[in-house]
Amino acid sequence: MTNLRKTHPLMKIINSSFIDLPAPSNISSWWNFGSLLGVCLIIQILTGLFLAMHYTSDTMTAFSSVTHICRDVNYGWLIRYLHANGASMFFICLFLHVGRGLYYGSYMYLETWNIGVLLLFAVMATAFMGYVLP
């Protein structure tokens, strides 16, 4: 009798994606940081959009708009703290992801490594524009 998870069309997709995943047997927790970067980036984008809905950049009203977010907006304090701590978590995951690549010798794949370096520079430039300059 054949196994249902290998014959049923829907279960076959789930089986090949989750159960019989074509991954090396020596994969470790260091390989999770790429997906954690994606989660952190999605959190940053969503919380940044919600904060931008209520923030004003005028020098006279900027502080009062931040207090408005924390006091008057439903869960505004949580959105603000998620955005602030999400940025720190993003960079921690980013540096651990790069460190894993250095440790395992991923710099030998020049095209992939150079694209990663360009993305790192773009992230650092974006962080500079959004954090240091305002």
Curated annotation (Swiss-Prot):
GO terms for cellular component: mitochondrial inner membrane. Signal peptide: none annotated. The keyword Mitochondrion applies. Heme b b566 binds at residue 97. The chain crosses the membrane at residues 33-53, 77-98, 113-133. Component of the ubiquinol-cytochrome c reductase complex (complex III or cytochrome b-c1 complex) that is part of the mitochondrial respiratory chain. The b-c1 complex mediates electron transfer from ubiquinol to cytochrome c. Contributes to the generation of a proton gradient across the mitochondrial membrane that is then used for ATP synthesis. This is Cytochrome b.
